[in-house]
Amino acid sequence: MTAILERRESTSLWGRFCNWITSTENRLYIGWFGVLMIPTLLTATSVFIIAFIAAPPVDIDGIREPVSGSLLYGNNIISGAIIPTSAAIGLHFYPIWEAASVDEWLYNGGPYELIVLHFLLGVACYMGREWELSFRLGMRPWIAVAYSAPVAAATAVFLIYPIGQGSFSDGMPLGISGTFNFMIVFQAEHNILMHPFHMLGVAGVFGGSLFSAMHGSLVTSSLIRETTENESANEGYKFGQEEETYNIVAAHGYFGRLIFQYASFNNSRSLHFFLAAWPVVGIWFTALGISTMAFNLNGFNFNQSVVDSQGRVINTWADIINRANLGMEVMHERNAHNFPLDLAALEVPSING
């Protein structure tokens, strides 16, 4: 009898826990994805803060030349970064217990791998949590679909690219100047500016910003006046009211006359679908481009493609970009190799005598 009562109590406790986890009445929804999201993001954030402040230099290139990234080792907010895991580690899973000591783990850049893997798991769970809350509330799942774009972008630069290049040392450093360095080296090695998927991403981000600004300014400018001319239009509204606060017909008419009739949406759902889909699809393409360039399927190469009747090269902008790429490539990882692959000889010259 006692055992039965204990089992009922245990089941009841588990049931209450399940109800609390999945309750939409909590101030912040937790959800089953949140059970994994909370510890992973807390771990990534905590280690990032500690390492950004106090991590010792990391031997990123695996040539016994450590690079300093933390504040206590001479950096500031702009130059500081979490230095990627050493090329000596490559793609090996490198938790603390795989190193001979914590000092060795820090020297080889263990914190970078720890932060990145926990972060990617955390943001993936955040996306799942968005779907889960939408499901509980009877909503459609497109919020999580939209969030998949930045998740895909982060996964591309932190996981897919290192896998393709064979080492976590090629991942994006976690810092401001480190991000810019990653972009410059990526251009030098993969010619990303000449990749059509990157072009689609630029159109998505800049176009999304333009459309967002246009939509926000149109809505704000076409409020339905609920007040007299002598008082502010803002006085006619309450936050969260059910009634619409702007006139889409007026906005459609304004924009249709500003450009042309069919450049303007007269359906609110179509408009907002477009506002969501444009940047999301663009960022999807950029993430796909990074993931293909990770395996060295690079941007277009139009170098020396225009010649005169004598066979002399007439330089185009492609040749200017190529010269810049070579300059950037010979400058990075300056002590890891004498020449970049582009400038290395195909065959070792024979030596007589």
Curated annotation (Swiss-Prot):
Residues that bind a quinone: 215, 264-265
Membrane topology summary: Multi-pass membrane protein
Site feature location: Tyrosine radical intermediate: 161
Record-listed [CaMn4O5] cluster binding positions: 170, 189, 332-333, 342, 344
Positions with a binding annotation for chlorophyll a PD1: 198
UniProt modification remark: Tyr-161 forms a radical intermediate that is referred to as redox-active TyrZ, YZ or Y-Z.
Residues the entry annotates as binding Fe cation: 215, 272
Function noted in UniProt: Photosystem II (PSII) is a light-driven water:plastoquinone oxidoreductase that uses light energy to abstract electrons from H(2)O, generating O(2) and a proton gradient subsequently used for ATP formation. It consists of a core antenna complex that captures photons, and an electron transfer chain that converts photonic excitation into a charge separation. The D1/D2 (PsbA/PsbD) reaction center heterodimer binds P680, the primary electron donor of PSII as well as several subsequent electron acceptors.
Protein name: Photosystem II protein D1
Organism listed in the record: Agrostis stolonifera (Creeping bentgrass)
